[in-house]
């Protein structure tokens, strides 16, 4: 043990064991107010938000009594989000439709942007642009936002009585119930991040090896799985909110 401790201390002193300094790929940073900001994520997230806001403006700008094809599409998306929210949350789903819808649409468009938008055209001093959900910072932020939402939902309905769920059905399960609230955002964030990162890496490798026909089916499969991941994230977020309001597992 003494030898092992000495070896670890030596590595730390020499700077070879600094886990916080390990990075995957190259990153481009901005310095804002003394903070180091991940510029790639901000740029791609702003593009996705602009696409969503532009689509929303087009959807509500001139509604017709006899809906057009575009209006039908947006109404279908809204009904789909309402159905997901109602199924998972229950009768009090109404106030949560905007939140669940925002999560679903942001993740869906972010995932698809990695395959459909020509990010490579934009040249950066370091690194390159990719889907926002390809970065662990984005998925962790979305997962933490979901955690805040279901804590707020439970506390707003039950007050401090919400915390009684941690000792149900028996106080022996208190550590497990507390641990569950930590594993929820972890599972949400790493599932989304891992799937999107793996999908983009597979496409990049196949394009470099066989740049003609073979990558195309994989890209279509990636689009499908990207949509499924957005649905899974939104459905689980709604389920957690419904669970916190109902108080069952």
Curated annotation (Swiss-Prot):
Keyword annotations: ATP synthesis, CF(0), Chloroplast, Hydrogen ion transport, Ion transport, Membrane, Plastid, Thylakoid, Transmembrane, Transmembrane helix, Transport
Membrane topology type: Multi-pass membrane protein
GO molecular function, one term: proton-transporting ATP synthase activity, rotational mechanism
Transmembrane stretches, start-end: 40-60, 97-117, 136-156, 201-221, 222-242
Any one Gene Ontology cellular component term annotated for this protein: proton-transporting ATP synthase complex
CDD domains (alphabetical): ATP-synt_Fo_a_6
Cited Gene3D superfamilies: ATP synthase, F0 complex, subunit A (1.20.120.220)
Main localization category: plastid
Record keyword Transmembrane present: yes
Subcellular location: Plastid, Chloroplast thylakoid membrane
Pfam annotation, one family: ATP-synt_A
Function: Key component of the proton channel; it plays a direct role in the translocation of protons across the membrane.
Subunit structure: F-type ATPases have 2 components, CF(1) - the catalytic core - and CF(0) - the membrane proton channel. CF(1) has five subunits: alpha(3), beta(3), gamma(1), delta(1), epsilon(1). CF(0) has four main subunits: a, b, b' and c.
PANTHER family noted in UniProt: ATP SYNTHASE SUBUNIT A, CHLOROPLASTIC
Record-linked NCBIfam families: ATP_synt_6_or_A
Stated family: Belongs to the ATPase A chain family.
Protein name: ATP synthase subunit a, chloroplastic
């Amino acid at each position: 043990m003494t030898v092992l401790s000495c070896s670890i201390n030596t590595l730390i002193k020499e700077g070879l064991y600094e886990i916080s300094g390990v990075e995957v790929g190259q990153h481009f940073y901005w310095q804002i107010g003394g903070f180091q900001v991940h510029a790639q994520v901000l740029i791609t997230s702003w593009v996705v938000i602009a696409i969503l806001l532009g689509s929303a403006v087009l959807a509500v700008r001139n509604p017709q009594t006899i809906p057009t094809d575009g209006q039908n599409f947006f109404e279908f998306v809204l009904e789909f989000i309402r159905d997901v929210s109602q199924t998972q949350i229950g009768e009090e789903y109404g106030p949560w439709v905007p939140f669940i819808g925002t999560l679903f649409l942001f993740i869906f468009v972010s995932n698809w942007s990695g395959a459909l938008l020509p990010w490579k055209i934009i040249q950066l001093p370091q690194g390159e642009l990719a889907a926002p959900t390809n970065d662990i910072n984005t998925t962790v932020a979305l997962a933490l936002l979901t955690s805040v939402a279901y804590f707020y939902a439970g506390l707003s309905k039950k007050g401090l009585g919400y915390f009684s769920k941690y000792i149900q059905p028996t106080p022996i399960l208190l550590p497990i119930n507390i641990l569950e609230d930590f594993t929820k955002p972890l599972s949400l964030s790493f599932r989304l991040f891992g799937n999107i990162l793996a999908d983009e890496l597979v496409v990049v490798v196949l394009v470099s090896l066989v740049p003609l026909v073979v990558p195309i089916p994989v890209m279509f499969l990636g689009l499908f799985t990207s949509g499924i991941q957005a649905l899974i994230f939104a459905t689980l977020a709604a389920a957690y909110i419904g669970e916190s309001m109902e108080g069952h597992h």
